[in-house]
């Protein structure tokens, strides 16, 4: 038994024997040594509320609430990460019963409800968060993704930037270990399939380069390798790989329009899932490519007409829409196929990969 445990037991015995002043003093010592000791905080709060110890009852009760919410939030977050959505939902609801303004619990409950496929409740809590923070780009985007309000033609630059800045440090681990992320490898395979085996000699743009996962595969084919991304935190990690000749913090279509006829190859792994209407991006890619240049990219596939903003906050496209849009932009499809891009919530995410040549 630790010294603090002995101190707590002694305080409890003193409280039972009616020695409230001495007991309260010891409970306070316990909390000084161990600020998150819930039992000591509860005992002291009860004594203060009953008038058996000095102090502000509201402040004493707040200490209890803070300890309970923090502890419960930790359990809820762990449950959410491991796909125990039922446990996470119970935890977040318990927190909000104690503190209705606990913002992280509101967001966590929205995420857990979405993971549990309760889209109505997910929308309710994302909307609650968005109403509290109307300038939060992610909340506003997801509310739209869940079907409330008009569907934007693309995710805002601010949303994309904030989303990827927030988990840049853990990006590679999450994608490769948790989600079995395959898009860069699939794009590399498609490149080799269309005759891109020759090492060196290509001016390549890694569009939405992120941390450089695609760049690792394509460096061997590049006389120059340029990466572009909206997230400065992702670009820092890409720079650390030492594989890029240039890294640009720019919006993709703007970047490509500003560099006419500069690239032999443009690759974009899981980039157009943040763009619904592909016309502007494909037109810009056509401008940036040299005559006969190739663009290879992936989209999340869906059977409905055109494109749709899904509840995940990402866009999915019908392959026929991709082919039609590329033809209008001045491309011919060399090859296209469906494959699994990654695993999410235990389910495969089906995608469409295409290699287009400028004509």
Regions found by a protein language model. Name each.
Residues 205, 210-255:
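Class I SAM-dependent methyltransferase SAM/SAH-binding core
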Residues 257-266:
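A short acidic, Gly/Pro-enriched loop at the edge of an enzyme's catalytic core
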Residues 279-291:
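A short glycine-rich, Lys/Arg-flanked "PGG" loop and its adjoining helix->strand segment in the class I
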Residues 297-315:
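Short, glycine-/aromatic-enriched active-site segment of Class I SAM-dependent methyltransferases
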């Amino acid at each position: 038994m630790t010294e603090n445990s002995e101190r707590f037991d002694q305080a409890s015995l003193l409280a039972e024997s009616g020695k409230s002043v001495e007991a309260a003093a010891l409970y306070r010592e316990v909390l000084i040594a161990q600020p998150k000791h819930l039992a000591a905080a509860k005992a002291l709060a009860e004594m203060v509320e009953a008038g058996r110890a000095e102090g502000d009852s509201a402040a004493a009760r707040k200490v209890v609430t803070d300890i309970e919410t923090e502890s419960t939030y930790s359990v809820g977050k762990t449950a959410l990460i491991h796909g125990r959505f039922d446990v996470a939902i119970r935890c977040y609801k318990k927190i909000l019963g104690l503190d209705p303004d606990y913002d992280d619990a509101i967001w966590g409950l929205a995420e857990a409800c979405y993971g549990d496929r309760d889209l109505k409740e997910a929308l309710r809590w994302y909307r609650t968060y968005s109403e509290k923070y109307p300038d939060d780009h992610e909340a506003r985007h997801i509310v739209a993704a869940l079907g409330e309000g008009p569907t934007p033609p693309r995710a805002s630059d601010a949303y994309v930037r904030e989303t990827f800045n927030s988990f840049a440090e853990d990006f590679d681990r999450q994608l490769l270990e948790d989600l079995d992320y395959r898009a860069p490898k699939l794009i590399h395979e498609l490149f080799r399939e269309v005759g891109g085996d020759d090492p060196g000699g290509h001016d390549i743009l890694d569009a939405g380069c992120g941390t450089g996962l695609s760049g690792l595969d394509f460096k061997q084919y590049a006389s120059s390798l340029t990466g572009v991304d909206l997230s400065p935190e992702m670009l820092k990690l890409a720079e650390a790989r030492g594989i890029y000749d240039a890294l640009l913090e720019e919006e993709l279509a703007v970047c490509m329009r500003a560099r006419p006829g500069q690239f032999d190859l443009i690759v974009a792994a899981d980039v157009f899932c943040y763009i619904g209407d592909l016309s502007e991006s494909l037109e810009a890619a056509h401008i940036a490519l040299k005559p006969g240049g190739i663009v290879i990219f992936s989209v999340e596939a869906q059977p409905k007409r055109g494109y749709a903003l899904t509840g995940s906050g990402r866009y999915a496209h019908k392959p026929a829409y991709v082919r039609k849009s590329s033809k209008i932009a001045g491309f011919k499809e060399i090859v296209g196929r469906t494959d699994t891009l990654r695993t999410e919530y235990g389910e495969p995410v089906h995608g469409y990969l295409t290699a287009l040549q400028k004509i």
